[in-house]
Amino acid sequence: MIEHIWRPETGITEIEGDWHALRASEVEGIRIVWGEQRERLKGSQQLTEFTERLSREWAIETGIIDNLYDIDRGVTQTLIEHRFQAEFLSHGSTNKPRDYVVRLLRDQKDALDGVFDFVSQRRELSTSYIKELHAALLRSQTHTDGIDPSDHGIQVPLIRSDWQVQPNSPTRNGKIYTYCPPEQVASEMDRLVEGHAAHMHNGVSAEVQAAWLHHRFTQIHPFQDGNGRVARALASLVLVQAGLFPLVVTRDDKVGYLDALEAADIGNLKPLVNLIAKLQRAQFRKATAISDEILGASTDVQQALAGLNRVAEQLLDPQTGKMASAFNHARILADQTRQRLARLRWDVQAALRRVSPLASVTVKLSEPQTDRPFQSHITENAYKWFGYFPNTDSYRDRVCLDMVWRRRAKFVFAFHGTGRPFNGSLVCVPFLEFSDTDETAQTRATLIPVADEAFLFFYSEAEDEVLTRFLDWRERVLVTALRELTANL
């Protein structure tokens, strides 16, 4: 079966409809808050190390996504933390020669470093730069997979930094994918660059720009090999240019990534935009840990005093600026959740009374005297579950569905700040807590997360956009929680 990714009757197409309908509102919040935090951390060793680790992660994962090599997870983390050295690649940790893998990793990291340089030099995207980027990414690759006239797989010499001269028709899942024919690649690439320039001029949001540029580039598939790596580098360029994080697509994201690209093939760019937003949230959560590291690592008195003054100034009037806006969002979301749980409680209670006739379900709100255990649970599990460090001093609230039958369980939505000092972002963390009494009358609590990620929102987001995102996320959480409750009756 043949799948035409690039269509000759249209070529690459513009963004369909109003781009505002595609945007992810939290990305602008990430841009603003990360920009403020990055400025505070400017010149710090922690910021430099974070950027280096991020670049190394990008370099490793972009090759894994393209099946250049495999590296096991433990070694991946070692390489991210300690640079690319062949001795870290023990026997069996990769499926390719160690020195070759290290060369590819260094090439890919150097290429991303080149993207950062491109942005800092305020250069404009051009076809010549895209060729330059391709040459950097594939510097150590000399051959690529091909097919001979007898339909046998062979290795063919790789052409770097120039457009393909033979049709590119890879096969996946029994389908043959066809892209732009070689004779039209140059004109289509000119159109791609012109389209990107128009988006920049018109202020199209970064996540939409990145999704469009990535997908339309892959539709053209201008190079003999390495198109996926170049596409992710171009998307990263757009995001970094906007003050965001590079596009780190990990092996765990691969299925969703390919599905999003296939949705874009049939005209729906939104899943790819949403994936980019999700990956930005993931990097932002990692970035919030830097401030905590600096607060703990500061040994200079003046630096410590400067940090103290910044926090004191921020806490001077909690009703103004970013704090007031963020806290107002949190109160609205908590109230919406209280109303939703109040409607849900009767159905849950009716179900539990099939098991225990005296079962009861009530909605409970945050109370100072009962908050401490929940704060402890959140502090202990936030990083393990969701990869961030909580700040319950800046803000905390919770809404809870308290269920008592033969067992006792609490379904909790906990709201609190992130970052130290508070950076204008808050999260909602949902979890189930089951409490059981053992034969010695000791109560054991078991906590179960009921979401893939915490809900992250920002002071700079519009109230209606935060609420729209939250309601969709919350309904998915409710489904997961009810399934867990069913499994633990």
Regions found by a protein language model. Name each.
Residues 1-224, 229-489:
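FIC/Doc superfamily catalytic core
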